[in-house]
Amino acid sequence: MPEDYTSLVTAMKALTQASAVTSEPDKVLKVAEDGWDTRPDADSYGEIYLEFETGSLDGDNRKKNRAFEGSVHLFSRKRDGEGWPALIEQTLTEYCDSCWRLDYHTHETETNLFHWEWVYQVEG
């Protein structure tokens, strides 16, 4: 996995740990337990939830110097995402110099969660 994407994930996790000290537990950003490729269960993740996914564009994660596609998913019960979408956007811009945005979209899920997705190509 490209170093920039690794540092981005580290930054996101640090950001979420910092949020855990809030006195309002419903606004704490939860991170997927393993950090990758999981989907939230609406009843078990509180108000807000973050996940990361990554993989090489050609499907072979073993080779070095590959272009990777990475994505960050944010789920929230509130339409404004408690301000997290803007903070995540800022973190993506700040920590991932080699990230090229492929897609960004939002929608409401079948479990009444609001979903933001940032998809990037990351040069290896």
Task: Label every model-predicted segment.
Residues D34, E82, S98, F114-W116:
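Short, low-complexity intrinsically disordered segments
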Residues D43-E89, T93, D97-D103:
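Short, conserved turn/kink motifs that form compact alpha/beta structural patches or helix kinks used as
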Residues L29, T93, T109-T111:
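Intrinsically disordered, low-complexity regions enriched in Ser/Pro/Gly/Gln/His and often acidic
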Residues M1-A11, F52-A67, W100-G124:
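Short, charged interaction patches at domain edges and termini
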Residues M1-D58, D80, W84:
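Small/polar-rich, solvent-exposed N-terminal microdomains that initiate assembly or binding
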